[in-house]
UniProtKB/Swiss-Prot annotation:
Its main location: cytoplasm. This is Autophagy-related protein 31. It is found in: Cytoplasm, Cytoskeleton; Preautophagosomal structure. Keywords: Autophagy, Chromosome partition, Cytoplasm, Cytoskeleton, Karyogamy, Microtubule, Protein transport, Transport.
Length: 142
């Protein structure tokens, strides 16, 4: 099986995040690099390959995990299902446009640092408009 690329792009930009990393863990450059967050410390664990996991490796993995993407493949290595386990993001959908590309559509949590006394009214209006777009998109996906 050739390495595949997982691309995660945030739906409607509450804060623009898009991530591209190769299966080998190398960040891929993008023309929108100023709006891009690259995945770091990528670990791969494959079902049935317990011999690659020792006690020292598991301690490393468990302390640094932020987001977990579970990709379920069938016997022909076709993607059957994708699941995202994260405190910060919700998976809205996925697509497999090319043989080695997995595109995830994600939605980030709303930031909770709203302090109306210290923010410009125009910025607050823009922020709530973005949040309303997110909520509408979530309701349509249900």
């Amino acid at each position: 099986m050739e390495p595949f690329v997982i691309t995660a792009s945030e739906c409607d930009c509450n804060s623009a995040h898009s991530s591209r990393v190769s299966k080998d863990g190398y960040a891929l450059s993008d023309e929108l690099s100023n709006e891009t967050m690259f995945l770091t410390q990528v670990k791969y664990i494959f079902e049935g390959e317990e011999d690659h996991i020792d006690d020292n490796t598991m301690q490393e993995i468990n302390t640094d995990i932020v987001n977990v993407v579970i990709v379920e493949l069938d016997e022909t290595l076709e993607i059957k299902n994708v699941e995202l386990i994260s405190d910060e993001y919700q998976l809205l959908g996925f697509s497999n446009d090319a043989d080695n590309d997995l595109n995830l559509t994600i939605l980030s949590e709303f930031p909770a640092d709203v302090s109306p006394g210290t923010r410009d009214l125009g910025k607050l209006v823009t922020r709530y408009q973005h949040q309303n777009k997110h909520l509408k998109h979530m309701l349509q996906e249900l």
